[in-house]
Structures are given as structure tokens and as C-alpha cells.
Amino acid sequence: KEGKVKISKQSPEGKEIILAILHPGEVFGELSITGQEKREEIAIATEDAVICMVDVKDLHMLMEKNPKFNMSITKLIGFKLKKIQNRFESLVFKSSEERVSSFIKELAEEHGKAILGNPEEKLIQLKLTHDDIAKLTSTSRQTVTSTLNALEKSGVILYDRRSIFVKQLSKL
């Protein structure tokens, strides 16, 4: 309902990968409908958050009685599966720098606000550190810093701690 939640996973050695940063209205834990009781991911509120919880039995009942709701859940799972597939392909086929650029483009398309109706310009107002972006793209913080600096130097983005202004979306 409110706030942001970071979904992550840690290796036995303590290395963290951020799977998602969720915004108000986004859902997590939906795979519990498949019978998976124990989750390995960690959900942490990164700012004050209001979270609604639905019992799995109630969710099953809603899905059985409401075909539109059932379809919405199916679409949600399909959308998340597609994002995971895209991320996997990115890890396999793209360089670290390309992963950072692709991530910025994805953020702009999903969370960016259009500027004066120009489809090339998007303002992303998310508080993400270089370390957060590194953990979301499976790169190092240094790679994120150098990639963002290169994108800024080439006029593709403007970046500060609170926002990313994408000036040329098609160049990402």
C-alpha cells in the first residue's frame, strides 16, 4: 500500500543479490499459491511501509470464485516470469556495462515520468545507491559508477542520489 520493499537473497557466504525493489501496489510472495511454504528470499522495508497480507486459503478461494481475479494473478506471475527470463538472458549475453544500461532503461520504462510528452526523456525518482544497482544487475559498484559516469558524459542521462534523468532513452 505504501513505501518500498527490497526483495533479496543471500548466499551462504553473505553475498546479497537484490531480486526486486517493490513500490506501492506491487505484490510479493505470490508463489505461495503453488504450495511453496518456505521462502528463501528476504523482504525488507527500505522506508516506512504499509503491507497487506492475504492468507493463502483466502487467496485460493478468491481465485476459484472470481475468474477475473484468477486471470490477474496468472498475468502477474507471467509478467514476473518474463522479467526473470529477461534478467537471466541479460546475465548470460550482456556485459556488465550493458546490464547497467538495460536496467536504467527498464527503470525508465516502468517507473519513469515523461517530461513534456517527449518519449525520449524520463525522470526516475528512486533512491537507489550504486551498491543497490550493482546488486540488481550482478555487477560491481565500481562498474555501476563508471557506467553511469560514461552515460552522463555522453549526454544520455543526468544522475544524482535522488533521481536519474534519462535524456535519450533510445541510447540505453
Predicted regions and their residues:
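A short beta-strand-loop-beta hairpin characteristic of the jelly-roll/cupin
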Residues: V5-I17
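Phosphate-/nucleic-acid-contacting segments
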Residues: E109-L172
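Cyclic-nucleotide recognition modules
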Residues: A20-G78, K82
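A short beta-loop-beta micro-motif enriched in histidine and acidic residues
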Residues: K15-I17, E37-R39, E121
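Structural motif
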Residues: K4, D48-V50, D132, S163
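Polybasic "coupling" helices that flank or enter modular domains
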Residues: T46, P67-L136
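Glycine- and acidic-residue-biased ligand/ion/polar-headgroup-sensing regions
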Residues: K1-S8, P24-G25
